[in-house]
């Protein structure tokens, strides 16, 4: 467990360094985000000097790293606000969106996998296979744009911008209405992969000899299904946890398309304007959070599967 924790922290810092290098060598400057396009180069250089952007790459990163190790993530170049303050304002929205989508995706994947096995080789099984593997394989970005076009422009039945309407930030139903499309996009865009994993593990469980013996003993089918579900949930949960980082990145993409007030929209805006403190803080935070969810899923998997409890966390 300790090795995994140390490795996760190392990966988090290494990810921030790679991201910093990419931003450093990309075109553009934060100075132009403050409306100085028409100003002289000397004025732009003065702004970059005030922000410390005139220093060499390694020196800039070293300054950020030492501050981050002390818990100081700095302030936004764009707004001048504390990075921690900006993250705190948006993290709840991202958590609600990501958690809601992940739970719905998990339940739907397991349900459809069981339903497909129950009606194996039937018309229902073929429909599930077709929908999952031929329709729901679009990237989140593409599917989100399609949903904006259909539900926001053509039909105009659901909101496609923001996490709530202005003045209705505390209205539960209004916030729920703004969640529908982002959650659906996340679920449908990931359903093909997660359903395939759930089907494989559940079908493998049904093929186990002890399960076949239960059929031979004429045990009630619902009891057999319960045992199969209990047996197959452990690897399914472990896989979901291992996919936390990629799912989180998908959540960020969906937030940016729907202008959802979460960490994702903040991250993409900061990347565009080269707002280093926010980008590095969010990358670091995202990797650590994904590592935490992976670790948590391993614990749940061991609880679900008693045979794994004897294994050490490595």
Please describe what each predicted stretch is.
Residues 2-12:
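N-terminal signal-anchor/signal peptide hydrophobic helix marking the start
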Residues 54-110:
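An internal, D/E-rich "acidic patch" concept
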Residues 91-124, 171-314:
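Alpha-helical transmembrane segments of integral membrane proteins
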Residues 1-3, 111-147:
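Cytoplasmic-entry segments and transmembrane alpha-helices of multi-pass inner-membrane transporters
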Residues 8, 90, 94, 130-133, ...:
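Residue-level signal for discrete positions within transmembrane alpha-helices
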Residues 11-59, 155-175:
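Hydrophobic alpha-helical transmembrane segments of membrane transport/permease proteins
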Residues 130-192:
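Membrane-water interface segments at transmembrane-helix boundaries in multipass membrane proteins
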Residues 40-70, 258-270:
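Short hydrophobic, aromatic-rich alpha-helical segments embedded in or entering the lipid bilayer
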């Amino acid at each position: 467990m300790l090795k995994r924790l140390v490795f996760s922290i190392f990966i988090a810092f290494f990810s921030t360094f790679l991201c910093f290098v990419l931003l450093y060598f990309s075109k553009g400057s934060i100075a132009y985000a403050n409306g100085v396009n028409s100003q002289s180069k000397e004025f732009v250089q003065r702004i970059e000097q005030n922000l410390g952007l005139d220093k060499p790459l390694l020196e800039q990163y070293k300054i950020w790293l030492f501050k981050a190790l002390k818990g100081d993530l700095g302030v936004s170049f764009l707004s001048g606000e504390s990075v921690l303050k900006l993250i705190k304002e948006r993290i709840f929205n991202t958590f609600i969106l990501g958690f809601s989508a992940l739970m719905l995706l998990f339940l739907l994947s397991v349900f459809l996998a069981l339903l497909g096995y129950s009606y194996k080789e039937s018309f229902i099984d073929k429909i599930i296979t077709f929908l999952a593997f031929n329709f729901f394989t679009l990237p989140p970005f593409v599917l989100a744009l399609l949903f904006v076009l259909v539900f926001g422009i053509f039909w105009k039945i659901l909101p496609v911008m923001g996490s709530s309407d202005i003045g209705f930030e505390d209205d539960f139903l209004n916030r729920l209405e703004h969640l529908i499309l982002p959650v659906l996009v996340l679920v449908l865009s990931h359903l093909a992969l997660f359903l395939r994993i759930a089907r494989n593990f559940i079908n493998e469980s049904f093929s186990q000899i002890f399960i076949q013996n239960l059929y031979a003993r004429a045990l009630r089918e619902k009891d057999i299904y319960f045992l199969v579900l209990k047996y197959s949930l452990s690897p399914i949960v472990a896989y979901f946890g291992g996919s936390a980082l990629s799912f989180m990145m998908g959540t960020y993409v969906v937030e940016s398309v729907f202008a959802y007030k979460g960490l994702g929209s903040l991250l993409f805006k900061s990347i565009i304007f080269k707002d280093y403190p926010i980008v590095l803080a969010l990358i670091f935070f995202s990797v650590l959070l994904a590592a935490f969810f992976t670790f948590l899923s391993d614990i749940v998997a061991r609880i679900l599967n008693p045979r794994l409890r004897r294994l050490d966390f490595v």
